Design a protein with these regions (language model features):
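RNA/tRNA-interacting regions in translation and RNA-turnover enzymes
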Residues: 1-299
Length: 302
């Protein structure tokens, strides 16, 4: 949105994302396997195993970047997941792969009444509407909300399983409210994330872990994505745009602004446009949503 605003004001800016071209599998030995049983609550789950890491204090530059946004450095692996959460907006979770029983991650709803101790040492009673990240024997993490006490990365960890997933906002919101857990991860998942971004973020994190903690990316990347998200189709009329903005906006200006917001015009008539809205714009699914996200740019042309 900022890049679009700058472009409309004669100051074009390009968003540059860190390259992940160096990502590769170093060892074909099988890593942790992933099974998603509840694809409604978890539309996409990506993960990768990194073996032979050295968990230690993060370098000063990483610690400083976390401190300036109010986060306490923990160790290099956890700090990387926290850093990338704020860099790219996608929550990550790191597990000690040695503690994943059966070498398998299973994403499923909890059995009602199951007891689970979270990272803060509190025992919680789960419901069948709480999505859990489990191994073959027990839950390890409340998906998208809070980690478990016994499955996280410590200084003794040598093998890491890195999770980059997309969880359904309603599931996350209800679980977070039920347990009073308002975390950085739940805050973002509740508002909806782009499922098409999980693999890029996973690769970015894995490369940074290799850079700061060593290790080899082991086995195939796990990526369960049964129903690929497609762009939203939205129809919007010039009359409605002008009515809600309170001023007649030139047609070419409207088109230019929508293009700068990465909304593709797939067809048009004298009355309006049919758009493909990017998947990452979770909150733009109606014509009024299109006008709302365009409002600042449209008002600038008064």
């Amino acid at each position: 949105d900022l890049a679009a605003y700058l472009k409309q004001n004669g100051k074009p800016a390009e968003l540059r994302r860190p390259s992940v071209d160096a990502f590769k599998i170093d060892d074909e030995t099988p890593g942790v396997e992933v099974v998603v049983e509840n694809t409604e609550a978890c539309p996409r789950y990506s993960g990768v195993t990194i073996k032979g890491v050295t968990v230690k204090e993060s370098p000063e530059w990483l610690q400083n970047r976390l401190r300036v946004i109010g986060l306490r450095p923990i160790n290099n692996v956890v700090d990387i997941t926290n850093f990338i959460l704020h860099e790219l907006g996608q929550p990550l979770h790191s597990f000690d792969a040695g503690k994943i029983k059966g070498n398998k991650v299973i994403v499923k709803a909890a059995e009602a009444g199951t007891k689970f101790v979270t990272l803060d040492g509190v025992e919680r009673t789960l419901t069948d509407r709480d999505l859990m990240i489990c191994n073959v024997e027990e839950p390890m993490c409340i998906g998208g909300v809070f980690g478990g006490l016994d499955s996280g990365v410590t200084e003794e960890t040598t093998d890491v399983f890195l999770e980059s997933a997309c969880f359904h906002p309603t599931w996350i919101r209800k679980t977070a409210r039920r347990f009073g857990l308002n975390t950085d991860a739940s805050f973002r998942f509740e508002r909806g994330l782009d499922p098409n971004n999980t693999m890029y973020v996973l690769k970015r994190a894995a490369l940074l872990i290799q850079e700061l903690a060593g290790g080899k990316i082991t086995g195939a990347v796990q990526d369960v994505y049964p129903a690929v998200a497609e762009p939203y189709t939205v129809e919007v009329t010039y009359e409605k745009i002008n009515t809600l903005i309170g001023k007649d906006i030139p047609v070419e200006t409207v088109k230019s602004i929508l293009a700068s917001l990465e909304m593709e015009i797939v067809s048009e008539t004298a009355e309006g446009l049919t758009l493909h809205v990017p998947v990452y714009r979770i909150d733009v699914q109606r014509d009024v949503d299109v006008i709302a996200v365009s409002y600042t740019h449209l008002r600038a042309h008064e």
